[in-house]
């Protein structure tokens, strides 16, 4: 079997049928679909079961208690039987010619990985690599992949990667990282990119990503921060390996600082957020950074003047000022949006 299409499923009853239909209508047919239901509380599991009964030779399903998408992905990997794996999120869908296009590249180049573009609801095309046109990237040229992966430039999505299963470590126990609920794609991709020797890039959009609001950040801002902290530590390990004497280390720290400010902004903007809870959250981050001073030492280059200002207020411990300034900026943005 050539392809295993892996779907982590959780509460996607509105979209899972469209997702599965887009795979079942592929022009290339040597594939299996592996669905891992992460304890859905809606009708997602029931809908998936109905498809499995209709296509038992193609679809396999694992139902389990909720443990988060990272551990769900690990189960899907262990269930996969295809020579190559690719991911499809349960609320997204793929273009009808994706598998055929991947097959042609495998026949021609037998790569360890194929990367392609995706679109969002806005019909905006996101280029996974900042390279014009199709290309083959050999091991000696992988620094371009490393930089774009670590600096967060549209390459962190698992859903735009077709990966040779033999280069993926499926046996390592990830249970210690079950708290990683944000950025799990990047967490999974780092060792895979490291192991890939030949990578094909297709400058075509084969994947449609639906923007669905999530409550992960809003329900537990510190969990969001904890995820980013773990991912940053993993990034730093690979950065040391890939660029032992390179200044890119500071750029990665800038990306991490931006993620942390994102968490603080989301926390402050959460509905019915009490100031007391917000202050507790920010102080927890500061306590953590006191123990791990990578973020708090030195100036960071953040993507906007507003975020630079947030960052300075955070470092100076002006937590209340930061809270009210975030609220003010959000109100101004909302007014502009409704004009």
Task: Give the label of every model feature segment.
Residues 11-25:
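Short, well-formed alpha-helical segments that are part of the catalytic scaffolds
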């Amino acid at each position: 079997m050539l392809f295993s299409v892996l779907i982590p499923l959780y509460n996607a009853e509105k979209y899972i049928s469209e997702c599965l239909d887009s795979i079942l209508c592929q022009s290339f047919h040597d594939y299996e679909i592996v669905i891992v239901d992460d304890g859905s509380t809606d009708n997602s599991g029931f809908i998936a079961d109905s498809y499995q009964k209709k296509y038992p030779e193609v679809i396999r399903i694992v139902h389990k208690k909720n443990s988060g998408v990272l551990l769900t992905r690990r189960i899907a990997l262990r269930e996969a039987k295809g020579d190559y794996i690719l991911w499809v999120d349960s609320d997204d869908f793929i273009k009808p010619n994706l598998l055929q296009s991947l097959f042609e590249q495998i026949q021609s180049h037998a790569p360890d990985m194929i990367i392609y573009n995706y679109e969002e609801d806005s019909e905006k095309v996101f280029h996974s690599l900042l390279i014009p046109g199709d290309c083959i990237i050999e091991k000696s040229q992988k620094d371009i992949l490393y930089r774009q992966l670590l600096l967060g430039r549209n390459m962190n999505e698992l859903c735009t990667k077709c990966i040779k299963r033999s280069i993926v470590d499926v046996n390592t126990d990830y249970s210690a990282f079950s708290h990683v609920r944000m950025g799990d794609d990047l967490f999974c991709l780092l060792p895979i990119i490291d192991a890939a020797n030949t990578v094909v890039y297709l400058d075509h959009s084969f994947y449609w990503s639906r923007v669905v609001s999530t409550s992960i950040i809003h329900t537990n801002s510190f969990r969001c921060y904890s995820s980013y902290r773990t991912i940053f530590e993993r990034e730093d390990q690979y950065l040391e390996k890939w660029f032992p004497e390179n200044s890119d280390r500071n750029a990665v720290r800038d990306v991490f600082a931006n993620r942390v400010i994102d968490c603080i902004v989301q926390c402050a903007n959460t509905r019915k957020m009490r100031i007391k809870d917000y202050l507790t959250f920010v102080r927890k981050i500061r306590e953590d950074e006191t123990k791990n001073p990578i973020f708090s030492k030195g100036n960071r280059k953040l993507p906007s003047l507003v975020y630079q200002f947030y960052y300075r207020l955070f470092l100076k411990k002006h937590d209340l000022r930061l809270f009210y300034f975030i609220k003010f900026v959000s109100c101004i943005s909302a007014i502009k949006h409704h004009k």
